């Protein structure tokens, strides 16, 4: 199943919330993304059926290996793109919003170049 942007956003939100809180419920995801609980329920059903997440009997969400891989890829893109934008003088809030838009559409090759460029900046080679 090909994930749409929203599916990637849900997986990224679960990853971020897990890092912050240790455990994640649908209501946490709704708050993080600013969507309704019914919207989250529909999305979680689709992500479960696609094998990206599991939900235990207490309603706790977990990423499967497949879901973890997607979430990590999107979250890395988000962080790198936001850092590059802030390095260009974009404020943190705008950089985060723009990174969220770009992270879904940028090619792997272009992202690799951006990541390498940021590493050169951090290493003092630029």
Q: Where are these predicted regions, by residue range?
A:
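DNA-binding alpha-helical recognition surfaces that contact promoter or target DNA
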Residues: 12, 42, 97
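Residues within the alpha-helical elements of helix-turn-helix
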Residues: 32, 70, 87
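Arg/Lys-rich, alpha-helical DNA-contact motif
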Residues: 75-108
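Basic, amphipathic "hinge/linker" alpha-helix immediately C-terminal to the N-terminal HTH DNA-binding motif
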Residues: 59-77
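N-terminal helix-turn-helix DNA-binding core of bacterial DNA-binding proteins
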Residues: 2-35
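C-terminal regulatory/oligomerization modules of transcriptional regulators
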Residues: 97-126
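Canonical helix-turn-helix DNA-binding module
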Residues: 26-57
